[in-house]
């Protein structure tokens, strides 16, 4: 029996020299409220109101009033993203691989093809809030690093770029729902004056890069500024035409290309064909001599200028007037000091495009030039500080009026995980690179998930105290130099070494929407869990003699032998690659027979916490002060750590109840030396959580408030309590007696609280003792009417109810491991091919 009762009494200072009686007498005493109160006073557990100042730091745990200053690393590398494109016909591909899919798998895969996110309310924030001033001392560096990260994501096809209110561009391969289809092709009609030629029609409905300019641009709407001339060659099919074509287009939206906030006083995105800025040189003047340009000034001071160029002219590096671009204005202005930005701008002739456009353009719902969340950079993870990670804050969808309730999904609990994975298989884990960015998002969700930036000029102006943003005169010469400062100049000079001409590109405003699911939204983990669990379900059915399991982006494969595992690895890797799932082969880990997963080590003997967690716990106890009140926020962090390992201790969660109580009361907690010693002893020896075995229940327990009864095989026992007890307490005591009398690992009971194995609501001492006694016991529910122990508990020993045949099947929780599936047709070839086309990195020792 696991509990030495005297030992428990000594541990909790209950022993006053008297010899402990039998368990049936002693255990009910632990439920006594008076004894629990005395022990709490002895251990100083209940004294929450203290006058001594609280301690706000214990080891690495910080509590209230502590601000950890984030550290910015100017050397951060932006991680590279593979060209991730999940195959659209993923369901068909899975069916070719494994035969018909189950309803469950189909439903999950349809959820993510494409994912949809349509909240009822969305708050739009000004572009200035797009990049958070998370590092006040490194504003400019952080701005450019973040812009570079966003540019990388856009290039990798993870973001859309807002081009106009109703159109966006992106890179990478398009999905069918991203095409603008009109009878199977994209058709834009010009006005009657040019005849009814429909141009730019490509059967696929996807615009190629070469024709992108004119098509979208032909939709230039009539703005408040009056009619604008239209630019450029009509289509790639009519290369010779040049000159200015005034297209009469439908007056609907007021703004076209720029994303400059409407109050900022100028629209600075030129509408250009090859989307690049000109060389400010003689070439420019030569090329511009034969252009017809038109410039109109509006009452509000907006200047908008469009040019028309022959496609092959020398000036196809065209752009709007220099005056519309904050960066290039410095070229023609007099330096205001030795730290004037004009020195930097004059360093190179060609600053590249003001604006880049993607390979494909699509229609989107009306999208304002605003953001719905801010972004900033942090270390990729505590072990990798060389690379950065983008944090996207869409917290508006978790609070206030814009709150969205996220779908719940099952997380395997410790016992289910052990039942499932504790086996004598050889394991490896796969690393899915950028797992979230595999799942495509419908373009209609774009207006709700916007990130971006207002451009360097406004960002710097907003943060520097000496300059005001004046709506009516912003962008004019007198305050162009307001942003010049030594700090900005030095930062930009250093950044110029890294980014070169891209400094100009990144200094323009931009609005981006997500094309794949972002990490900062509660929907994403749910979708990722659905996706990987469906894929694993398919893999398990294709290889019934192996085990594949996933939690989020952590996928593990188990097989009987190492050779078998490697063959399985090859086959599964090929299958995942064919679906468009990107694996990182360098991060594939081969664990052998004990698997590291979700913070646990799982072997055939059961489950234990991983070593780094055990070390953290030891460190925590070393640093834990006694007789000093510890702030409840620190206690919360301590409980988080200890709670993870609690199932591996003898007393389990109930031992932490005094700490939980103080956190709930938001009071400080003082560790007495005895309580600290008790906890420390609990956590120094961790016992594995073993796998439950199926079996037949032979032992039953039942209780009434006044007595208890047991049925052990054909033997019946009964007893009475000294005083009536609450029914749940009585049932728990009966279960403890059944375990200690019979040693059975399987007990039948009709009480749901005992079945749940959560003993935190009982009197503290009883909860600890019961957890100790019942550790490793499995319970089976038996209805009261059929419970053989029912009669003995009511004091009737003469009546024998026949023993039930109650089989026990260990549960794997709601991890829906084996979706019930139609049988796989027998003519499918066996799928583990030993002669693999993929070379396995593993070599025999």
Swiss-Prot record:
Could you say how this protein's activity is regulated? Activated by host HSP70 and HSP40 in vitro to be able to bind the epsilon loop of the pgRNA. Because deletion of the RNase H region renders the protein partly chaperone-independent, the chaperones may be needed indirectly to relieve occlusion of the RNA-binding site by this domain. Inhibited by several reverse-transcriptase inhibitors: Lamivudine, Adefovir and Entecavir.
Q: Which residues bind Mg(2+)?
A: 431, 553-554
Query: Where do the record's region annotations for Polymerase/reverse transcriptase domain (RT) lie?
Result: 349-692
Cite the EC number: 2.7.7.7, 2.7.7.49, 3.1.26.4
Q: A Gene Ontology biological process annotation? A: symbiont-mediated suppression of host innate immune response
From the UniProt record, list the reaction(s) this protein catalyses. DNA(n) + a 2'-deoxyribonucleoside 5'-triphosphate = DNA(n+1) + diphosphate; Endonucleolytic cleavage to 5'-phosphomonoester
Leader sequence range is: none
Per UniProt, residues of the Reverse transcriptase domain are 359-602
Q: Which UniProt keywords apply?
A: DNA replication, DNA-binding, DNA-directed DNA polymerase, Endonuclease, Host-virus interaction, Hydrolase, Inhibition of host innate immune response by virus, Inhibition of host RLR pathway by virus, Magnesium, Metal-binding, Multifunctional enzyme, Nuclease, Nucleotidyltransferase, RNA-directed DNA polymerase, Transferase, Viral immunoevasion
- Renumbered residue ranges of the record's region Disordered: 226-245
Region feature Spacer, mapped onto this chain: 180-348
Site description Priming of reverse-transcription by covalently linking the first nucleotide of the (-)DNA, residues in chain: 65
UniProt-annotated stretches for the region Terminal protein domain (TP): 1-179
Instruction: Please name the InterPro entries in this protein's record.
Output: DNA/RNA_pol_sf, DNApol_viral_C, DNApol_viral_N, HBV_DPOL, Rev_trsase/Diguanyl_cyclase, RT_dom, Viral_Replic_Matur_Polypro
Q: Name one GO molecular function term.
A: metal ion binding
Further remarks about this protein from its record: Hepadnaviral virions contain probably just one P protein molecule per particle.
Job description of the protein = Multifunctional enzyme that converts the viral RNA genome into dsDNA in viral cytoplasmic capsids. This enzyme displays a DNA polymerase activity that can copy either DNA or RNA templates, and a ribonuclease H (RNase H) activity that cleaves the RNA strand of RNA-DNA heteroduplexes in a partially processive 3'- to 5'-endonucleasic mode. Neo-synthesized pregenomic RNA (pgRNA) are encapsidated together with the P protein, and reverse-transcribed inside the nucleocapsid.
Question: Domain description from the entry?
Answer: Terminal protein domain (TP) is hepadnavirus-specific. Spacer domain is highly variable and separates the TP and RT domains. Polymerase/reverse-transcriptase domain (RT) and ribonuclease H domain (RH) are similar to retrovirus reverse transcriptase/RNase H.
| Protein family (similarity comment) | Belongs to the hepadnaviridae P protein family.
What's the protein here called? Protein P
Q: Which organism is it from?
A: Hepatitis B virus genotype A2 (isolate Japan/11D11HCCW/1998) (HBV-A)
